[in-house]
Each structure stands twice: as C-alpha cells, then as structure tokens.
C-alpha cells in the first residue's frame, strides 16, 4: 500500500495560555478595583529544558478545542494548577521555521479554590513530561522579569504589574449566551389548509367529478368504452356560476391565510434540537474556563435547557427571570415593549455593577440585544467604538468589567463559541459545491 503523504503544515499555529497570579498572603481576598502592590503577588512560570528558557504556561489547541479550553488545559498540564480565566492580554505573534506564524492568546489567570465547581467540570489531564516542562516556580514579578527569556513575555509581565498598581488586575466577568439551536417548527394546519385550498387543488377536484367518476360508482361490471352510453352534454357554465366558484376558492384561501397569520402571532417556544443539545453539553468547557458560578435565564425553553448540563454536572442552579422574556403574559400584558426592554437593560446594568462571581445570562432575541446594548454603554475607548457583535447559536459574549471610583467600566469584550459541528450544515455546503 502506498504511504499517505504527510499533511501540509498550517501557516498559522494557534496556542493559548495564561499569566497566573496569586497573593503571597493566602488569606487575602481579591477585591475588584483595589490597587495592589506588585510585591504582594506572585506569578507562575515554567521552565522548558529543550529551549533552556523560562516562560508562561501555554500550548497549542487540540483538534476541535476552543482557545479558552486550551488555555486552562495547558496550564494544568504544565503546572498542575487548575485555573479560571479573567481579562484577555495582548496576543503574541512570532515567526517559526517553515514560513509558519505562531499566535499565542493569553488571559489573566487565577487558581481555582478547592471544591470549586469548575474543578469538577474539567476533563482529567496528564501532566506534561519532564522533557517538556522540568520546573515550575511561583516568583515575585521583580524576579520574574530577570528570569523571562523572551521580550514579549516581559511585556506581558509589565502589563500585569501596571494593572495591579492601577486597581485593574481584579475584574468581574459577565457572559451573555445566545441559546443553542432550537427545533424548526413544522408545517401547521393552516399551511396544509392553504395548500388544499389553492386554485390548482380546487380545479383538480372538479375535474375528477366527471363521467368516469359516475361510472366507477355504479357498482356493476366495467363497461367497455365503446359500449358505454353516450354522456349527456354538460351545460356551459354561466358567468354567475364561474363567479360563485371563484368566490368560494378565494374565501378558502383567505381563511387559510388568516389561520397562518393567527398562528404566527402565538408565542413560539421551541425546545433545543439534537444539535442544540450537543451545543449545551459543549458549553460546559467554555463556562468552566471562565469560572462561571451564577446563571440567569429567561423562562423560554431554549434559554433554560442551554444551561441545564452545566448546572446539573457542576451542582449549580439556573435562576429564571421573567423580565428577560419579552413574550411574558398575564400580569405583564399591559406593559409596553419599550418598558419591557427597559427592565431587561436595568437587569443587565445591575449585574455589571455587582462585585460578584462570574455570571452568565442566557437570553434570546430582542432581550439579548438589549443586554448587549447595555453592556456596550459601559464600555470605554476602543471597546466602545467596536462594532456590536452578532452571536451565533451557542456563542457567548464575554464582558470583563473593571471597577473604579467612577463605577464599572467594560474594559474588554470577546466572543467565544462551542466548536460543535452540525453534520446537516456541512452536508448542505458540500452538495452546493458539487
């Protein structure tokens, strides 16, 4: 058998890692917005014997793995520390041999407290061999600056030190999830009625009621066509008969259309599709990477179900919030659309102002857009000027919030999604190519 050719190397090698820090005093609690003396923290470094250098824990993404999942996995493999991610840092790019470029995405990382739900939700990993990582060290930022080999790594360290001094190292995280894909509504009775009442269907039924229909219903033996009695000529339809038949058909079509319009007005609350269920399970890794500990969702089925695997496996709960559902009825029936959107924005603003654990909001439709709009209202600088993100099913918008004397500021926005592939979508794309 002829040997298979080696795969062509990718031009871009994607990697991910984290600058993990902790207080030198284990009893000290991180407070958002509090300035930190760099002498009061330690950073986690790794030594690679192959390159004889000290650097930050990082590594390549595996097949089908998201960047954030790769970052926490690589840190645990190389250091044994289970961490959660905070704000993103500057992406590092440098050339490799063979015309390749390596792109390394970094986040601020913090060790997970013992018993945290994120620890239970992580897949088990094997420690990196000593030929890859032979030493790890917690050290002061001052000493780390002397130990680091690459200039880019030292720039990342300087960024961490500046954030600590300015009270920007400790941030809060708010995630906005677009629920997973839902089932597609099937053709309703109104649609079937519309099809059966079409002019073509009506004319077909009229044509079937001729002489052959009467002979079939006679109950006796079939009569050869040549011996059949001559049919009486049908009188030509009068203009009044034609107008009456047309009016009946028009009434049937109008009635069917009215049923479809009425059905469209009814609130649709589809459950997750088979693909949406897979997305919900794959969200566990993404939410765990950011250490999500609280979850809010609208009462809509997809919003709830998208967080069910994460809550069930991690021992958490999902708080249902009626105000996040713009189709709410009953006591809310008298409230206008703008007032409902205002309540959604107020709920999002409250979450932004809290000094709370990482939180996810699972919201659909216009309510989700209102939440994102409120988050962007708290953004500053380049973040405020960036184009509003459009989320796909199963994607999350991650807002990293700094808390200063003037209130919360969204310092970074990033989008992440599950890497689940939909076979049906790929099949449709393939058929179009061929």
Placement of each model-derived feature along the sequence:
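N-terminal strand-loop-strand
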Residues: 2-56, 175, 179
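A short, acidic, amphipathic alpha-helical segment used as a generic capping/interface helix at domain edges
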Residues: 339-353, 357
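Acidic, glycine-centered low-complexity repeats within long intrinsically disordered regions
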Residues: 207-216
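Conserved histidine-centered catalytic loops in small-molecule metabolism enzymes
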Residues: 288-322, 347, 402-434
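Active-site-proximal alpha-helix that buttresses catalytic centers in soluble enzyme cores
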Residues: 59, 70, 170-201, 221-330, ...
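Beta-strand elements within well-structured catalytic alpha/beta cores of enzymes
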Residues: 172-178, 296, 356-371
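Unchanged
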Residues: 61-152
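Domain-level recognition of soluble alpha/beta enzyme cores
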Residues: 379-409
């Amino acid at each position: 058998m002829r040997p298979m050719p080696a795969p062509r190397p990718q031009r871009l090698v994607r990697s991910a890692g984290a600058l993990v820090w902790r207080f030198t005093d284990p009893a000290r609690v991180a407070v958002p917005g509090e300035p930190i003396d760099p002498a009061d923290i330690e950073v986690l470094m790794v030594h690679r014997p192959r390159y004889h250098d000290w650097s930050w824990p990082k590594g390549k993404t595996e097949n089908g793995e998201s960047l954030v999942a790769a970052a926490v996995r690589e840190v645990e493999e190389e250091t044994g520390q289970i961490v959660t991610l905070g704000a993103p840092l500057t992406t590092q790019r440098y050339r490799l041999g063979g015309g390749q470029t390596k792109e390394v995405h970094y986040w601020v990382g913090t060790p997970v407290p013992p018993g945290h739900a994120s620890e239970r939700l992580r897949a088990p990993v094997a420690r990196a061999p000593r030929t890859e990582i032979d030493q790890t060290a917690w050290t002061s930022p001052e000493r780390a600056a002397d130990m680091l080999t690459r200039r880019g790594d030292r720039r990342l360290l300087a960024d961490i030190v500046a954030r600590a001094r300015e009270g920007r190292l400790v941030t809060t995280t708010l995630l906005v999830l677009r629920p997973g894909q839902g089932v597609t509504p099937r053709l309703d009775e109104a649609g079937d009625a519309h099809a059966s009442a079409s002019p073509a269907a009506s004319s077909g039924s009229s044509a079937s009621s001729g002489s052959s229909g009467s002979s079939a219903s006679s109950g006796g033996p079939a009569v050869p066509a040549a011996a059949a009695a001559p049919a009486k000529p049908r009188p030509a339809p009068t203009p009044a008969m034609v107008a009456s038949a047309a009016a009946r058909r028009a009434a049937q079509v109008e009635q069917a259309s009215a049923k479809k319009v009425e059905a469209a007005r009814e609130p649709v609350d589809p459950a997750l599709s088979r693909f949406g269920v897979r997305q919900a399970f794959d969200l566990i890794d993404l939410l765990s990477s950011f250490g999500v500990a609280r979850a809010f969702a609208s009462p809509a089925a997809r919003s709830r179900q998208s967080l069910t695997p994460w809550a069930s496996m991690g021992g958490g709960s999902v708080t249902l919030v009626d105000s996040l559902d713009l189709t709410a009825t009953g006591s809310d029936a008298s409230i206008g659309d703008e007032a409902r959107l205002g309540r959604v924005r107020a709920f999002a603003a409250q979450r932004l102002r809290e000094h709370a654990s990482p939180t996810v909001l699972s919201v659909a439709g216009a309510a989700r857009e209102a939440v994102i709009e409120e988050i962007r209202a708290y953004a500053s600088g380049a973040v405020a000027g960036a184009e509003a993100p459009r989320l796909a099913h199963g994607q999350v918008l991650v807002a990293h919030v700094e808390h200063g004397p003037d209130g919360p500021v969204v310092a970074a926005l990033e989008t992440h999604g599950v890497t689940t592939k939909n076979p049906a979508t790929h099949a449709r794309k393939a058929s179009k190519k061929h």
